[in-house]
Swiss-Prot record:
Involved in sporulation and maintenance of the mitochondrial DNA. Is probably involved in a pathway contributing to genomic integrity. The gene is IRC19. This is Increased recombination centers protein 19. Belongs to the IRC19 family. It comes from the Eukaryota. It comes from Komagataella phaffii (strain GS115 / ATCC 20864) (Yeast). The lineage of its organism: Eukaryota, Fungi, Dikarya, Ascomycota, Saccharomycotina.
Length: 204
């Protein structure tokens, strides 16, 4: 995807930013919502290190916003096997771990696994808007609905994942088969990310 963000993402950086200390985070923020807000802000502080391009920085910002507003359990139900709901403490633990992964991906280490993971995720999410039947999951859809005045719960609607159930439908035409291949590849990507999340205790 030559026009995607991967070519331009993850600029070189020599010094890691200060990561949140769990004890400090819990002491300074007495409830779950405030803890998430603090972590959300810390994710956004990495924005300058994602890319030298303003549009990619904005895309990263929108993606972080989407991830913090969506119903994470709705997404996990579709791609995580076996599925077990997370309690609030587990969610905080995973968001902290996710921040560490993104931070490490921004460090000047071209061969790091974290760097490759973040590049891949940004590239796939950037391409979502161009795949028919999946625009509801894209960052662009999220932004458009907000511009229309929709509430933020638009990213918690079950219909966002209707396309997953359509993959098993048999399509005969060449055009439909090509589309089905794209959908299947996207589903496999999300399943891979979900598996990574379960092993690494993250929420990418």
């Amino acid at each position: 995807m030559s026009n995607g963000p991967a070519k331009y993402t993850i600029i070189n950086r020599l010094v890691q930013p200060i990561l949140p200390i769990k004890k400090q985070l819990l002491e300074e923020n007495p409830n779950h919502s405030l803890r998430l807000l603090s972590l959300y802000r810390r994710h956004l502080r990495l924005r300058p290190f994602i890319s030298p391009r303003a549009d990619i920085k904005q895309f990263y910002t929108d993606l972080v916003r989407l991830r913090f507003k969506e119903d994470i359990e709705l997404r996990r139900k579709h791609f995580t096997t076996p599925y077990t709901p997370l309690d609030k403490d587990s969610i905080i633990e995973r968001v902290i771990r996710t921040l560490e992964i993104v931070n490490n991906g921004c460090v000047d280490s071209p061969n790091s696994i974290e760097r490759q993971i973040i590049r891949n995720i940004l590239d796939v999410e950037y391409a979502n808007k161009n795949i028919k039947m999946v625009p509801l999951m894209s960052v662009e859809y999220f932004k458009e609905e907000l511009w229309k005045g929709r509430e933020l719960d638009v990213v918690s609607e079950p219909k966002l994942y209707d396309w997953v159930n359509k993959i098993d439908i048999s399509n005969k035409s060449k055009k439909k088969n090509e589309q089905l291949n794209l959908l299947t590849a996207l589903r496999n990507h999300y399943r891979s990310v979900a598996s990574f999340n379960e092993v690494q205790k993250t929420l990418l």
